[in-house]
Amino acid sequence: MKPIPAAPEPLGQHQDSPRRKDKGEAESERQRTRERLEATLAGLAELGHLRHRQEVLIKSVLSPGTRTHGDAAARTGDNPRSLEEKFLEDNILLLKKQLNCLRKRDAGLLSQLHELDKQINDLRIDVEKTEEHLETDSRPSSGFYELSDGTSGSLSNSSNSVFSECLSSCHSSTCFCNPLETSLNLTDGQAKSADDFLEWLDYRESQHETGTVRRSFSAPHSNSVDIEADVHPKYQCDLVSKNGNDIYRYPSPLHAVAVQSPMFLLSVMGNIKAEEPEEGIDHNDNDDCIVPELDHLKDEDSFLHQSSLCSLPLSSAKKMDGYILSIIQKKAHPVRTNKPRTSVNADPGKGILRHGSMCVKQTGGVSQSNAVNLKNSKQTCLHSTGMIAVDNSTYPSLKQCSKESLSEQLESKRMPSISTYPSCNVNELQSQNNSRNTVKSVCQGLARGSVAMTSNVQKENVTPNALANLSNTSSSVCNVTPGESMQNSPLLPQEIKVVPPVKRVSPQNTLLSYHASSSFDERPPLDFKSEGSSSQSLDEGLLVNAHYIPAQQQGVKLHKHTKYVKIVKSSTLKHRANVQYVAENGSQTLKEKSKVVGKKCRFPDDLDTNKKVKKSTLRVKKTAHPHFEPAVVGRNPVAVRSGSKSHGHSKDVVLAKPKHKRGDYRRWKSSAEISYEEALRRARRRAQGEMVGVYAQVPFPYSSPYAYIASDSEYSAECESLFHSTVVDTSEDEQSNYTTNCFGDSESSLSEVEFVGESTTSSDTDESGGLIWSQFVQTLPMQATATAELQTTAKAFVKIKASHNLKKKILRFRSGSLKLMTTV
């Protein structure tokens, strides 16, 4: 039965042993505190005794008898006595200073006694706390609570605030005697507060118990006696601001708070080791801070150590920043300067024009002889492949590019540079861009107005070899001056040369039509006008001809759909000359062109969504080529030449904005004005004796603004995407050109109608170039004005395949002979 009662005894002992242990530690703490206070009082008494003794010595020295005795001794050569007196005088001065310090310290000692009483009470309350909890407390390691918290009751607050001035003065004057100096310089050779004196007393009396004392004093409200020996050295060093101008000495009331501020250099350097505040607590002082009493070598070593510690993360951070910046620069859009940045080398990856919506790559076959200067090299890069990849997202930036290229080509107009390029590059690019790859070189070549050529353009039946010839032609023609036009003519295809007789050109092997009048017109080049347009409007820049070819039936195969637009009669399509317009408005020509440069082009994507299906419809207006018979050519050579000149203008692709996006469109004309203008035009045509089925040249005052680059007509380039319609009107007779417009993939009665280019023109030639819709749907009763001149035939009803928007516009001007059939 004995083991049974023995079992609860160890359990009770285990329960009571922590309490007894804690009580024992509390008692020992109180005992050590009492002994420390007694030692302090003993030290004060000793100082008082020393003071009294020194006073006696001073009085004895200063008495008259002693002075005379001293003088006599000095005369007799009692040197040891005189030296002793000097030593005593020095001690007296030191003791006076020490007394002043002790007077100030008395108040501090009283406050320290109160603090010790509070800590003893705290120890009695927190007896049941374990050592692990006290050790893992993170507040002492922060250096804030024990050094700067004014309400925490810590010793360091009072000591730093009360004794900082005293200790700094005492240390500078070395007022303490040897035992006190050893106590105050125990930690790092620097003068400390009265807490160091207490620590020294404790260290002298009980060295073996200092560990527990420090651990117990590292409670939430601990004094700085233990902290002074164990804290991180950065809390005991001088503060140097980052700019190096301000230096704060160590004993200052706000030192602990300032150390934690990022404004100071030492806190930044100390952060490297601040990750482990409790493990690395006993680092040397020369690792992280500057102690005034240490060696200069140690200071330099500490600074080198700190700089080496800080340089590693700084260099890695710089490398990381550079890497991030390089990635950002690669991904970011390039800064678009005024001039396009081109390269003259033959590397295809480097010769990219990174400007706006243009991307012209330079192939390996580029001849380097053209790179005479920067401007010629830019033109070489532009014409090297004859390809333009139009970016639909950045087309508003073309305004600046077009202005820049305009001025560049004006300067390089007199610098001929002829180059030919292999055709394999064009074949490679044709699969990407279909037939959009020649407009830029065509427009620039025509803008020179210097090479006289003629040809017919078959728009869609383009073979790779034909595209190769086209690129050769465009690149060799763009920089040719008038004097060199006949010398360079062997570079051109056979059918492009200028011959006096009219030759019949087959539409299958003709690609391009260059023409210019022999009277050279000083017109600035207009090359970047159509850069932002769609593929349909880009293609139409090629559909201009110079000579009239007899009528023939021809089919145009479209890109995206396999429909054919059959053209039976193309003998009545008529292009007007604008030679008179250029002569009359010669001073306004440059003004008009500079204004048109600023007009932005609209892509088909900007239009309504119900018209996107109609993107494939290409205009047949310019495919129906006007023709002259040899008799007419011989009879009116000036008119032929002026006609060729006017069609050179119409080669520049004219783009149109939708009406709701343009602010300068014109008003609708009244029916009286339309009737008067139409009757006047018919009277002029009949006065010139036009023949059946043959286009006569229109007199000079009626030049077409839609064949001119300054026109901004909605019908000139983007009509198929705006309206997508086929307007077929009846003619009054065979001689009347009062006929139709055919646009797109019409499946209505095209085989019964005639093509008239006049209905797409307007006699109004002001700069705004807006659309007058009534001139395109000329179905108003104009017969009343011209009844005497026109032969009347039976009226036939017309079927119009129109969209909803077109129907609304036609309904405003409908007549009795118009039947609307809306198919969309």
Swiss-Prot record:
UniProt feature, compositional bias: Basic and acidic residues: 16-33, 520-530
InterPro entries assigned to the protein according to its UniProt record, in alphabetical order: Dapper
Protein name stated in the entry: Dapper 1-B
Pfam families per UniProt: Dapper (PF15268)
UniProt keyword Transport present: no
Known function: Involved in regulation of intracellular signaling pathways during development. Specifically thought to play a role in canonical and/or non-canonical Wnt signaling pathways through interaction with DSH (Dishevelled) family proteins. Binds to dvl2 to regulate the degradation of beta-catenin (ctnnb1-A and possibly ctnnb1-B), thereby modulating the transcriptional activation of target genes of the Wnt signaling pathway. Seems to promote beta-catenin degradation if not phosphorylated and to block beta-catenin degradation if phosphorylated by CaMK1D.
Note: Named 'dapper', an antonym of dishevelled, because it acts as an antagonist of dvl2/dsh.
Record region (Interaction with tcf7l1-A): 2-343
GO terms under cellular component: cytoplasm; nucleus
Tissue-wise expression: Expressed both in the dorsal lip in early gastrula and throughout the posterior presumptive ectoderm in early neurula. Expressed in the dorsal neural folds at the tailbud stage and highly expressed in the tadpole head, including the brain, retina and cartilaginous branchial arch derivatives.
Subunit text: Interacts with dbf4 and tcf7l1-A. Interacts with dvl2/dsh; the interaction is required for dact1-b phosphorylation by CaMK1D and seems to become disrupted by the phosphorylation.
Keywords linked to the UniProt accession: Coiled coil, Cytoplasm, Developmental protein, Neurogenesis, Nucleus, Phosphoprotein, Wnt signaling pathway
Origin species: Xenopus laevis
Highest taxon of the lineage: Eukaryota
